[in-house]
Amino acid sequence: MKKILIVEGNLKEENQDFIDAGIPTHTESLKESISYFTNNLDIDVANPSSDQDISEKVKDLNKYDGLIWGGSSLNIYNDTIEIRRQLDFMKECQKKIKKILAICWGMQVAVTAAGGLVKKCDKGSHRGIAYNIEINQYGANHQIYKDKQKKFNTPAFNFDEVVTVPESATILSSNQINNIQGLNFKINSSNVWGIQYHPEIPYEKMIRLIHFRKERLLEKKAFKSGDEIVTHVKSIEDEISNSNKELRMKELYNWINYLNEN
């Protein structure tokens, strides 16, 4: 049985707010999505920002066959102690874990730890959904997009984006808002598959997150008004009826297959 580590990107306070609101944490969503494909993985969870024993966990990273690093509401350029702890932990993971799937915030942490750059999006944001992600010629030949449609919509929630990739990185997909939606790079002993969007999170949770973060989103001017939120949520609800669960999660499925090779 393969052993993997899931890294929780949100602070424990944010996760407690999720729990109080009856919303699954990102780690819980990821575990549920993994279980759709397999129950034959031994899974540990770490939160570098909050775990007091994180230095002890660093010593044991060699025991993992793979790592999945999930989403967060943090902004990496804010350079807080909690964010620095995550970057330090990612650097250690990139030395010791061969197969890494970095999702949304996870991709931003992986890229930054490897010398790339993340900034606030210039062309807008994704608020529960990303439209028209296109797989390029490199992505079409990459295992992460095996059997994935060449243009697709997907759950997503991000206001920041990768603008400079690590040395030797290959961009795999993009859309009109983010030039880098998918990438692949190798560093030290790690092969990092990165995606800016969330195949592991259902649209229904994205809608709940929009309502949960309503005041924050209005303050950030992500939406002009409550009426715009209603209209936007309706468009996501329409997408639910058009989407296919297995196709939506194809990247996760393909990474699990990659994990189980050798």
Identify what each model region corresponds to:
Residues 1-88, 92-96, 220, 224-262:
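N-terminal beta1-alpha1 cap of cysteine-dependent amidohydrolase-like domains
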Residues 9-11, 116-188, 192-204:
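Pocket-forming structural segment of enzyme catalytic cores
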Residues 16-17, 55, 78-79, 111-113, ...:
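Short glycine-/acidic-enriched loop or helix-start segments at secondary-structure transitions
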Residues 19-22, 81-84, 114-118, 169-170, ...:
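Short, glycine/charged-enriched secondary-structure capping and boundary segments
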Residues 64, 68-69, 100, 104, ...:
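Short glycine/serine/threonine-biased micro-segments
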Residues 72-138:
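Cysteine-nucleophile active-site neighborhood
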Residues 170-262:
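C-terminal and late-domain segments of enzyme folds
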